[in-house]
UniProtKB/Swiss-Prot annotation:
Modified residues (N5-methylglutamine): Q251
Lineage: Bacteria, Bacillati, Actinomycetota, Actinomycetes, Micromonosporales
GO molecular function annotations of the record: translation release factor activity, codon specific
Protein name per its UniProtKB record: Peptide chain release factor 2
Gene source species: Salinispora arenicola (strain CNS-205)
Alphabetical keyword list: Cytoplasm, Methylation, Protein biosynthesis
Entry similarity comment: Belongs to the prokaryotic/mitochondrial release factor family.
Subcellular location: Cytoplasm
Amino acid sequence: MTDADFAEQLKDLDTTLRNIESVLDIDRLRADKARLEEAASAPDLWDDQARAQQVTSQLSYVNGEITKLTDLRSRLDDTQVLLELAEAESDPGVLTEVAAEITGLAKSIDEMEVRTLLSGEYDSREALVAIRAGAGGVDAADFAEMLLRMYLRWAERHGYPTEVYETSYAEEAGLKSATFTVKVPYAYGTLSVESGTHRLVRISPFDNQGRRQTSFAGVEVLPVVEQTDHIDIPENEMRTDVYRSSGPGGQSVNTTDSAVRITHIPTGIVVTCQNEKSQLQNKASALRVLQARLLERKRQEEQAKLQGLKTDAAGSWGDQMRSYVLHPYQMVKDLRTEQETGSPSSVFDGELDAFIEAGIRWRKQQQLSGDNV
């Protein structure tokens, strides 16, 4: 590849990065940083713990975005200088270094560009993720627990704070269901492409005959409700039941009735929370989950009205979107984007970025196709 080719590649990368800087508005991010730093330094910040956690979480996220953008700009400028040096000295060794830098830059800028595709009404929200075991008995419950760990590890890899609201354990092993939040801006826009039915194929560790088992689990991603959403639920529309928290195998893990189940009478939606020690805390968490489900229901109804379709609130649960095959071969494959890997262990350890980024791009293409119909 010639010097001119490298120069053209760098020019294209510079154009892409300038577009990203414009869309993400780095000047606004810097202004947000100053505002959040001022809020974080307030002496009474921790008088309201929920507010304090929100401020520190947002500040961490904004700092991360600014660092990514400034690092990319610095790397691009340094590579341009390196290319000029290679041209001046006619040094093939330096050109090899330039080629490697351009390859790395292209990958990093491509990953950052995905953020510019998150422009939906609720994409900037924090995310509430619900996982439910589906068909497959104990293997499905075990799969649900594997998915919970996978998403928590993904968040941990990125330094995103999470909070587990509810884990309902199955009798033999695994989880019937789990609900948690990812507390950073744009978590909903990022993770919403994970909604759907996930499928696991493996030799069951719970089958004495060592037979292959197919099991399913559903993932539902909702935007966290904010005050501006005005999701107010009258007390007479809710039935609240309390019970003792249970752990693996159905054993009781609390001597008081601290777990809470809320039923929304008009819709039949049921939410539970048992991870907090206090009944009041569990009720508050369960109410947040219920509000998120009602907001999603409202969003689906509005979308269906625009499209002239009948709302199917459970539709996403029936959409099989990814297979995890551990036997007779090893592969994870997204059925929408064709993204795949031969390393299921790394995926279950939270290496999801390639799948999520492909999902976001696929969703954007679907939206554009729909607009053109």
